[in-house]
Amino acid sequence: GVGLGNDPMNVDELKFVYENSQIALPSMATNFQYHSPLLLKTNINFIMVVHGEQRLSVTNPLPVSGDFITNAKVIGCYDKGPGKGAIIEVETTVNLKKDNTEICKLVSTTFARGDGGFGGPESPKKELVRPEGKPDYVHEINTKPDQALIFRLSGDYNPLHSDPNFAKSAGFERPILHGMCTYGIACRSIIESVCDKDVKKLKRFDCRFSSPVYPGETIVTEMWKDGNNVYYQCKVKERDKMVIKNG
């Protein structure tokens, strides 16, 4: 779904897709969020919903298989004002069922563009200040025109990413790439560039989605290393448009 295995001769990519040596990309843990019924119980306008931010804190490496227990709760609901939308934060904890080992915690921020003006508190501003100067690493990954149709098989069947008419009704010229696909591509870029291709070195992975990616575009991840921390941002090469910031 994020392009791993495009080169069948690249053994570093094969380990993510070949069952005899398979490991999981940490960002795959975000799949556990798709099954939360919390937002389905609200009256928000789902046509106008997009992914706003994503945070991942890794406690233990994600197994490639197993039974898991997830617990989700709403931890924040913020009002951007009439006509400006609302922000909803949901925290999901993921544990192994067999021994209750914690795997990770996820915080997903939903931007409900059509549901502002309900009188809630304003969203707190959280801006990261990255190191100055040119990035220490730059990594490019080309997406395919059918990338969203492949990625949706991970469990996110929102028609915004597959149905041209639905996408237009939501204000986009055509179906957009899942934010979680862009997130996974950024995760892959950092692991390949900074983590010596070792998934166990990634302990936290956060971002803010600032603009959509269209399938077929090239995602450029720029990274600044500061000790054990890596600051990053992503942009689309063809449009020179920032699509992820606060990474």
For the regions a language model picked out, list residue spans one by one.
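HotDog/MaoC-like acyl-thioester-processing domains
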Residues: 49-139, 209, 213-216, 220-247
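Acidic/His-leaning functional-site neighborhoods
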Residues: 144-220, 224-231, 240
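Short amphipathic alpha-helical surface micro-motifs
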Residues: 12-14, 32-40, 53, 70-74, ...
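Long, contiguous hydrophobic alpha-helical segments, chiefly transmembrane helices and signal peptides
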Residues: 25-31, 49-52, 56, 111-112, ...
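Hydrophobic, proline/glycine-rich low-complexity stretches
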Residues: 1-67, 194
